[in-house]
Regions:
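Conserved donor-binding/catalytic core segment of Leloir-type glycosyltransferases
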Residues: 199-224, 230-235, 245-248
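Short hydrophobic beta-strand element within catalytic cores of glycosyltransferases
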Residues: 310-314, 323
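Membrane-proximal helix-turn-helix segments that form the acceptor-binding/catalytic region
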Residues: 142-163
Length: 392
């Protein structure tokens, strides 16, 4: 729990962002919750943003570029044009201000050309090279656009005194593909998108009804492996295991008629009533099952761990830095099917006291020690203060 009299670091931080960090929906809530951590740890945290330049993305220039390049895709978001516009806007905003560090979250284009004479801390969960062709929506760009994107990434990393990444997967790319200094590159998980962490007593799953409650939580049915999760549920049922499946965040493409399946198309965590519904759903779950096809990190796995819910996902992207096998869940191969997931669930749930409960409790313990807002905040302060002491 946070102490009301916590002594904060005296470092002065500029939180540079082109988005509005007060908006929980911007950047999937990462900027909102990370700003919260910064304010808990540092005395001075000023927001340098949002940027007017971002409006260009939806304005006349973007429409003009789409007309010029027709169906070929030009990624304006990672372009030198945007980087120059950001440079002038942010240098103007920073003029005459004194800070120990500029904190740039997922802001490679914003800082690539920045000349602020203040050490920059860059924080992300991926590099341009990792993203390109990994996600369907981040593919098929013009060669010029790919070249610009890679150069922007390289300049941003070179322009940073400290590089923080949410996964070892991203660190490897930054160091090996972009020449990032390994001595100034650190692993720092992304914070969970929750306003308060449930008391540990509430997450205790000692009492059981004998029904295994599965949770599929995601907005993209196909990319998140919805059909595999559904197959796992049916596989468990065919084995005579009592179970339920809650599908939250999307609607399956085919209608499902099964009394054990509950579909919640959308929950708005900004609304108190729906947040309480989300919380109850998490507290009632035994496993989060998300056989995702592509994932840079997966904040939802950290959220599940905070509720002592083990996660079952795939070995892809940066998931290995948030799910530790046998500690807070398991990562299965991408080709694993529903029956494979059902095997893992059955093994643990059928031996509830000896296998499931220890996994549930170690999920919460791992969360508190490594991926909670408090653990992330402490590690970040340590990294920045050590960086400053090396320079003095």
């Amino acid at each position: 729990m946070h102490s009301p009299h916590k002594i904060k670091s005296g470092l002065r931080i500029a939180f540079l962002t082109s988005f509005d960090p007060s908006n929980k929906k911007a950047m999937s809530g990462v900027s909102y919750y990370f700003l919260k951590i910064l304010r808990e740890q540092f005395e001075v945290v000023d927001i340098i943003g949002p940027a007017k330049t971002r409006k260009v993305l939806n304005g006349r220039i973007n429409r003009l570029l789409r007309f010029i390049f027709k169906r070929k895709r030009y990624n304006l978001d990672h372009s030198f044009l945007m980087s120059f516009l950001y440079k002038f806007e942010f240098e103007h905003k920073l003029k005459g201000k004194q800070y120990d560090f500029i904190f740039a979250l997922r802001a490679s284009t914003e800082i690539a050309l920045l000349n602020a004479k203040i050490p920059v801390v860059y924080y992300s969960d991926a590099t341009f090279k990792l993203l390109y062709n990994y996600y369907d929506w981040f593919s098929g760009f013009l060669k010029l656009s790919v070249a610009e994107g890679n150069k922007i990434e390289q300049l941003a990393l070179r322009n940073s005194s400290v590089c923080l990444f949410a996964s070892e997967w991203a660190i490897k790319s930054a160091v090996e593909q972009y020449g990032c200094d390994p001595e100034a590159t650190y692993l720092l998980p992304f914070p969970p998108n929750v306003d308060h962490i449930p008391e540990i007593e509430l997450t205790d799953k000692s009492r059981t009804t004998g029904i295994c409650n599965l949770l599929f939580l995601g907005v993209e049915w196909e990319r998140k492996g919805g059909q595999i999760a559904l197959d796992a549920y049916y596989s468990l049922k065919s084995r005579g295991i009592k179970c339920s499946l809650t599908i939250c965040g999307c609607i399956p493409p085919e209608p499902i008629e099964d009394e054990g399946i509950n579909v919640i198309p959308y929950l708005n965590k900004n609304l108190e009533v729906e947040y309480m519904q989300f919380e109850q759903m998490m507290l009632n779950s035994h496993f989060l099952i998300l056989p995702t096809r592509a994932e840079c990190y997966g904040i939802v796995f950290a959220e599940a761990s905070s509720y002592a819910v083990p996660s079952l996902a795939t070995q892809t992207g940066g998931i290995g830095s948030v799910i530790k096998d046998g500690i807070n869940g398991f990562r299965l191969p991408l080709e694993a099917n529903g029956a494979d997931y059902a095997d893992v669930i059955e093994t643990h749930f059928s031996d509830y006291a000896e296998k499931y409960l220890p996994l549930s409790r170690s999920s919460r313990k791992y969360f508190e020690e490594h991926i909670s807002a408090e653990a992330i905040g402490k590690k970040m302060v340590q990294i920045l203060e050590n960086t400053l002491s090396k320079k003095q």
